[in-house]
């Protein structure tokens, strides 16, 4: 069965490539040619500056660096590379969908975006699993959490992401319609739609499920520790807040667009389509910018809610300031939680063994 020919697409960034006739409505023209270029400009400037400062601050930070900072630096690099391509798409939206920068950048920018989107999702998953080990299994984490392991995992993530982005080089092309150039996707086939469906599930929904599962377990353990200790531990409360905000930001950024993307792919398998193609395309055009915005949000989240990163950024921007101005403690929230929860877990094990011995 030949898939339906529609406006719908199967890559993260393809919401920027609807057919030209669909754009020729006044309301949609004002959205794509006025709002989106302004929005992308803000995302580009704040994201490039924020991620660059974050990378520099953590890379050149004095003293010992946290293990999770390796993932954060790679995530910032992934977002930074992604944001470098945003001006190309800004120009596209401002020119009413025309692609004026040639075939090489059409394929190349699409490939870069695809690679870094996969990389970002996988790195977020690795970060959640790293926090899960550090907080839920402190003893096991001491054996597994090594800098060499973190570097190796990041290298594997980049390699896999580069491989997963290769189909983009084959599917994207510079198409001329009525003499006007458009960076668009080739006509979808059943095989391509099937690949898009499998890729979407394995590179987004499965990682999202693992992220939510890890953070739910972490939050449950933190709440149990908080109730057991009976003290108002500000670091524990702040850690729970960071977890909730990180999950919420990731979910709000990606779930809406990828949900409509999933519906678009499923609809493409049907001759007439299960859903109205223009309605789905409009929904993806509206929710798509949220995915772009996610690349500039992470530095802000880390700066506001992670005092360790905040101190590193301030010291990077103002090296003349002394350490004691930001507190003399060098203990990170992860190390604090690991020690506290390790004692909590050992206490739980002791109570269980004691109950077992009494019952015997």
Curated annotation (Swiss-Prot):
Q: Membrane side Extracellular: which residues?
A: 1-33, 91-120, 171-192, 261-284
| Residues with the Phosphoserine modification | 359
UniProt's post-translational modification comment states:
Phosphorylation is necessary for YWHAE binding and efficient surface expression.
**Biological process per Gene Ontology, one example term:** T cell migration
Name the tissues where it is expressed: Highly expressed in gut tissues and lymphoid organs, largely restricted to TCRbeta+ cells. Expressed in fetal thymic dendritic epidermal T-cell precursors.
Q: Which SUPFAM superfamilies match?
A: Family A G protein-coupled receptor-like (SSF81321)
- Record has Protein biosynthesis as a keyword: no
* Lineage top rank: taxon: Eukaryota
Enumerate the InterPro entries for this protein: CCR1-9-like, GPCR_Rhodpsn, GPCR_Rhodpsn_7TM
Grouped into one coarse class, the protein's main location is: membrane
Q: Could you state one GO cellular component term attached to this entry?
A: plasma membrane
Q: How does it sit in the membrane?
A: Multi-pass membrane protein
Keyword ATP-binding on entry: no
Q: Which PANTHER family match?
A: CELL ADHESION MOLECULE, G PROTEIN-COUPLED RECEPTOR 25
| Subunit-structure text | Interacts with adapter YWHAE; this interaction promotes ER-to-Golgi transport of GPR15.
Task: State the protein's name.
Answer: G-protein coupled receptor 15
Q: Which organism is it from?
A: Mus musculus
